[in-house]
From Swiss-Prot:
Protein task: Associates with the EF-Tu.GDP complex and induces the exchange of GDP to GTP. It remains bound to the aminoacyl-tRNA.EF-Tu.GTP complex up to the GTP hydrolysis stage on the ribosome.
One cellular component (GO) term of this entry: cytoplasm
Location(s), subcellular: Cytoplasm
Superkingdom classification of source: Bacteria
Protein name stated in the entry: Elongation factor Ts
Family, per entry: Belongs to the EF-Ts family.
Main location: cytoplasm
Alphabetic keyword roster: Cytoplasm, Elongation factor, Protein biosynthesis
Source organism of this protein record: Prochlorococcus marinus (strain MIT 9303)
């Protein structure tokens, strides 16, 4: 892989509308060749996806996924720009895949990092700052370590940051961007809810032997 300059990355971004990191990777994979890098982005469905992301996505669909055994269920809203696209196989396939992803990730609570409340971030920071292994370290070093740990922890809570269950080489965010590029519309994961059978219900734990004994004496 070739080293690429910041100017090349910027030029490719201006040309394709793809993200900076995607452009850098495309150029590295293409030995700095702009034409090949553009083709690489198109094949990945990334080219122009960033430009589409600024357009309003008010159509779409609400999908469901019920896991085998019917113990976990998911409702998920996926948005696009037109009803025609919402009915298409690519969009419906993405809807199913992302809903399945939510079912497989019990720790996920938010769609994106921007949705994480400030108080949640501060709480995580407070917990990490109090770790025994950080005691005695300089404040600047401690802050840097905590920032890294928090970043990793917060990613675990975010749907778009998860490795895609069908292809761990990409994240859910990259999957959505790829499909958006193929469809030619802005596609956004709006919200989701994950249900687990019996979650939140308190069940009385009765000793079976005692219960049988009480039945005999009744």
């Amino acid at each position: 892989m070739a080293d690429v300059s910041a100017k090349l990355v910027k030029d490719l971004r201006d040309k394709t509308g793809a993200g900076m990191m995607d452009c850098k990777k495309a150029l590295a994979e293409s030995d700095g060749d702009m034409i090949k890098a553009s083709e690489w982005l198109r094949k990945k469905g990334i080219a122009s996806a960033e430009k589409k992301s600024s357009r309003i996505a008010a159509e779409g669909a609400i999908g469901t996924y019920i896991h085998t055994g019917a113990r976990v269920g998911v409702l998920l809203e996926l948005n696009c720009e037109t009803d025609f696209v919402a009915r298409g196989d690519l969009f419906q396939g993405l809807l199913k895949d992302v809903a399945m992803q939510v079912a497989a990730c019990p720790n996920v609570e938010y769609v994106s990092t921007e949705e994480i409340p400030v108080d949640v971030v501060e709480k995580e920071k407070s917990i990490e700052m109090g770790r025994d292994d950080l005691s005695g370290k300089p404040e600047q070093m401690k802050a840097k370590i905590v920032e890294g740990r928090i970043g990793k922890r917060l990613k675990e809570l975010v749907l778009l940051e998860q490795p895609f269950i069908r292809d761990s080489s990409m994240t859910v965010a990259e999957l959505v961007k790829q499909v958006a590029g193929k469809i030619g519309e802005n596609v956004q994961v709006r919200r989701f809810t994950r249900y687990t059978l019996g979650e939140g219900i308190e069940v009385d734990q009765t000793d079976f032997a005692t219960e049988v004994a009480s039945m005999k004496t009744a």
